[in-house]
Amino acid sequence: VTTKKWVQNPVYSAGSEKKDTDLLLIIDTSGSMGAITDPKSNLHQAVLAAYGIIKYFENRKNQIALLGFSDRITANVDWTKDYDSIREKLLLNGGGGTSFPIARIQSIIESSTNPLVTVIITDGEIQNTNQTIDYFKEYLTNGNKLFIFLQDRKSTIEHYKTLTNYGAKVLKTLTANEMRDSVLNEVI
C-alpha cells in the first residue's frame, strides 16, 4: 500500500490570484433621458441596470467610480467601495444637454491601478467622437472592457465600429435587463 504525496500547485497559491476588476459607470443624465420616477424613461432603465451591475461588483468587493453627465458633470464619485454612496448619487433626474466629459473620464481611468470594466449608458450621440474613440482604443488594448449602450432607436452604432474591432461591446438596448445581462455575461 502506498500513499500519494500531494503537492500544492503554485498556480493556486495565495497571492497569485487574478487582479480585481473595478467598474466605471458613466451615465447620461441629460433632459432627453427623462425622469427617474418614470419606469418607461431611459434614465429609469439606466439606473436599474446600474444597480444590478453595482451589486455584482459589490459582492466581489471591487471598487466603483461613477460619472453622471449632461451639459455638465452631474455626479462624480471617485474610486470607492462605498456602494450606498454610488447608489445615492444615481438617484437624480435628467436635465440639460449632452456633452461627453472625456477629459474627466481619462482622469478617473488613469487613477485606477486595476483592470477596468467601463459601462457607458446614453441615449444620444457622444460628442467629440474622434477623441473618444482614440482614447478608448488605447484603453481596450490594455486589457480593459468597454460597454456602450445606446438607448435611442435612432442612434447608430456605426460610429463605434472601430471600437468593436478592439473588443468593445456597443449595443442598442432599451431595458435594464438587457444592459445588466450584457455586462454580467461578459465579466462573470
Kindly label every feature range from the protein language model.
Residues 101-103, 156-188:
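C-terminal helix of von Willebrand factor
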Residues 16-121, 125-131, 149-158:
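Von Willebrand factor
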Residues 54-62, 141-160:
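A short, conserved beta-to-alpha structural element at the edge of catalytic cores
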Residues 131-138, 159-162:
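A short acidic, amphipathic alpha-helical/loop segment
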Residues 1-21, 180:
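Acidic/polar low-complexity segments with low predicted structural confidence
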Residues 15, 56-57, 108-114, 138:
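Surface-exposed acidic, glycine-flexible loop patches that form ligand/cofactor-binding
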Residues 16, 31, 83-84, 109-110, ...:
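Basic/hydrophobic alpha-helical interface regions
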